[in-house]
Amino acid sequence: MAKKGAGATRGISPVRPTRAIPIGAYLTVADNSGAKVIQVIGVVEYHGTRRRLASAGVGDMVVATVKKGRPDMRHQVVRAVIIRQRKEYRRLDGMRVKFEDNAAVIVTPEGVPRGTEIRGPVAREAAEKWVRIGSIASIIV
């Protein structure tokens, strides 16, 4: 039997940030894809129970609709990865992390960002899980 916590230093961080962004939430778009505000309409790979409203946290991919932005982007259904959330969550080292806003980056279904730059900081959990997002991020917290 493996020692307790043997794989904690390899690969993706085992931290599961608090799921604080429910269906219906509005998110700021932090890239230059053309969208400004999106509304969450679903969470990819969420398996709830008993009619529970799906919710997402940092690093999760969501399905959303564009509410504000360029005319060609508005009313489109897109996929996005959450990179910041207001609700604080705890990392394994005891540090608690929270951001000023709830923000996401629009991506393709494979996880490749549609924009070429990201405004503001990106949570380390999202940058580790989605490497292409981490590569274009200017600040990783």
Swiss-Prot record:
> Which GO BP terms, alphabetically?
translation
Query: Which Gene Ontology terms cover its molecular function?
Result: large ribosomal subunit rRNA binding; structural constituent of ribosome
Q: What UniProt keywords are attached to this protein's entry?
A: Ribonucleoprotein, Ribosomal protein, RNA-binding, rRNA-binding
In terms of domain of life, where is this protein from?
Answer: Archaea
Tell me the PROSITE patterns matching this sequence.
RIBOSOMAL_L14
| Stored SMART domains | Ribosomal_L14
- One cellular component (GO) term of this entry: cytosolic large ribosomal subunit
Asked if the record carries the keyword rRNA-binding, the reply is yes
Matching Pfam families: Ribosomal_L14
InterPro entries linked: Ribosomal_uL14, Ribosomal_uL14_arc, Ribosomal_uL14_CS, Ribosomal_uL14_sf
Q: What does this protein do?
A: Binds to 23S rRNA. Forms part of two intersubunit bridges in the 70S ribosome.
Q: Which family does it belong to?
A: Belongs to the universal ribosomal protein uL14 family.
Q: How does it assemble?
A: Part of the 50S ribosomal subunit. Forms a cluster with proteins L3 and L24e, part of which may contact the 16S rRNA in 2 intersubunit bridges.
Record protein name field: Large ribosomal subunit protein uL14
